[in-house]
């Protein structure tokens, strides 16, 4: 029996609508290249590498990013007591922070968040979509608003998430579109530090000014890869490893920034 033409037309319309909806879902966000920030201040607030002896050293990573009206906590270290103590030493009250971004679900990056939320519960927290239901429920139970991230998204003026990258450990990094170039902030760089930098360049079509955070013990060849990617300055810390930090320092010289807990970088 021959199918009526109107039924075929209706079916084709349904298929086209479905593709249109799915296409919107998978299309990467359009980024306004003119959406940028001026002065940026990054404070290494939690690290297993010492810089300022007044601050407590503990395994993990966290930094505070000041952007005029916005103050972002990127990762929270392993222990809330250490995090809160270091924030106090830096003269930062928990309630001054209005956005939290967690890079990935490892204890040395998320361990301080629940204690922090006791001091500042009504806050937006951006987490990779892959976070466990348990941790998401724990965070939500404190009163925070959770935003789950899968693809690149805008967080605030001039600040974006790369979206969750990687396979075994899914992780997001921050990209700050500054007037001097891209500032890329990584937690542990499980997806590969060069992959993260390439993703940022792909999103913005702009050169990286500074890459800061944990580089996850990459091979020495990464130093040359950074040069090819036109990375201007580097500030590796946390899980980067002494060998790669020494290699970066030899190659980058004045553009190598020695980082560690208590370090303040102003751009």
Regions found by a protein language model. Give the residues of each.
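Zn-dependent metallo-beta-lactamase
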Residues: 5-11, 16-68, 151-165
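Active-site neighborhood of phospho(di)ester-bond hydrolases with catalytic His/Asp-centered motifs
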Residues: 73-77, 97-105, 126-129, 184-188, ...
């Amino acid at each position: 029996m021959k199918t009526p033409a109107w039924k075929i037309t209706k079916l084709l319309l349904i298929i086209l609508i479905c593709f249109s909806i799915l296409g919107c879902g998978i299309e990467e966000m359009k980024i306004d290249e003119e959406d940028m920030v001026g002065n940026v201040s990054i404070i290494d607030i939690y690290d297993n590498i010492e810089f300022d002896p007044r601050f407590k050293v503990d395994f993990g990573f966290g930094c505070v990013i000041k952007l005029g009206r916005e103050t972002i906590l990127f990762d929270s270290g392993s222990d809330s007591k250490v995090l809160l103590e270091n924030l106090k030493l830096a003269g930062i009250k928990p309630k001054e922070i209005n956005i939290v971004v967690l890079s990935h679900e490892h204890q040395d990056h998320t361990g301080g968040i629940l204690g922090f939320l006791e001091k500042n519960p009504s806050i937006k927290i951006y987490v990779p979509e892959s976070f466990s239901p348990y941790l998401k429920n724990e965070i939500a139970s404190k009163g925070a608003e959770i935003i789950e991230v899968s693809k690149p998204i805008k967080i605030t003026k001039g600040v974006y998430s790369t979206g969750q990258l990687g396979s075994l450990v899914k992780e997001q990094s921050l990209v700050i579109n500054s007037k001097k170039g891209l500032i890329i902030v990584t937690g542990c760089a499980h997806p590969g530090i060069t992959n993260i930098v390439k993703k940022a360049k792909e999103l913005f079509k702009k050169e990286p000014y500074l890459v800061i955070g944990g580089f996850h013990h990459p091979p020495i060849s990464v130093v040359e890869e950074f040069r090819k990617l036109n990375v201007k300055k580097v500030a590796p810390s946390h899980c980067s490893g002494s060998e790669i930090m020494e290699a970066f320092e030899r190659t980058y010289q004045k553009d190598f920034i020695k980082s560690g807990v208590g370090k303040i970088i102003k751009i």
